[in-house]
């Protein structure tokens, strides 16, 4: 039966955009920002540490960050629609 692969995103900052083609062989390219010179690629979670070391050693890579998408809590507790508050009566002063 088909098993879903655990994937993780890497944000790779480059010195030059022309080097983006050299990084694509490490994973699946998701996004390339030519203006800000970074890539987002997805790799298998089990291969993360090995590929992270390999990519960090490349001379044309400025910085590599691991995506924090897995750390975000997606369970929203409570009702997102809020009821309007009823006006409260002011205490009488006298």
UniProtKB/Swiss-Prot annotation:
Pfam families: DUF2129. Keywords: Cytoplasm. GO terms for cellular component: cytoplasm. Disulfide bonds: none annotated. Its main location: cytoplasm. Coiled coil: none annotated. It is found in: Cytoplasm. It comes from the Bacteria. Belongs to the UPF0298 family. This is UPF0298 protein SZO_03600. It comes from Streptococcus equi subsp. zooepidemicus (strain H70).
């Amino acid at each position: 039966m088909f098993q879903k692969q655990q994937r993780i995103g890497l944000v790779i900052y480059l010195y030059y955009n022309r080097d983006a083609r050299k990084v694509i062989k490490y994973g699946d390219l998701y996004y390339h920002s030519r203006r800000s010179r970074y890539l987002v690629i997805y790799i298998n979670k089990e291969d993360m540490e090995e590929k992270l070391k390999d990519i960090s050693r490349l001379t044309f890579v400025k910085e590599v960050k691991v995506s924090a998408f897995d750390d975000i809590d997606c369970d929203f507790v409570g009702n997102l629609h809020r009821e309007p508050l009823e006006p409260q009566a002011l205490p009488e002063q006298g």
